[in-house]
Amino acid sequence: MRIIGGEWRGRKIEEPRGRDVTRPTTDRVREACASMVMSAFDFDLDEVRVLDAFGGSGALGIEMLSRGARSLITFEIDRNAARLITKNIESLCRDRSRWRVVTGDVLASASRGRVPGGPFDLVLLDPPYAFGAAPVEELLRNLAQQGLLAPGAFALFEHAASDAGAHPAGFETVREKRYGITSVDLLRWVAADECDHANDSDIDEDVPLEDTHE
């Protein structure tokens, strides 16, 4: 697998091995996702804080870093996959203050407000297709309620085209695209005034979560 665009364009990253460990996004869909994000932020990610909620291969979050995102927090529940994401980012980005990989359940962490690096301007949501929209809606609600979303934050949700997209309260659907068996929805949080944004934590906040290091 290679990085498609940005500073590290053409650089190789490793993919997790074994069936059912992750479902890496295809190059075509990854490029489409990146284009949607770049357009949403007027092609400038310099101040964008990214949460990759279901890291998987980590490729989509790495694409955002490559294209200039200010910071990236990646959650991945599978320990081996999280280690590989860490290895991949370490091979590309020497600035350790820009990223963090957390081995853990993002749903549980968000419900307790224990997600470092927020408030986020962009949330990447690429869970296993069997996951469904309901947990994604719950995650976005919790992120909003815990002050972990910046005003006007975007969320990018990749899901099976045969399944319904996510429609959590307080979000509007900006764009929907279909690529074969995959659909990608871009959502925007429009209810910022209803939530308290006091939790403006730094990326190295002392949060009792498990970081992954090689």
Description of each model-found segment:
Residues 1-214:
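Class I S-adenosyl-L-methionine-dependent methyltransferase catalytic core
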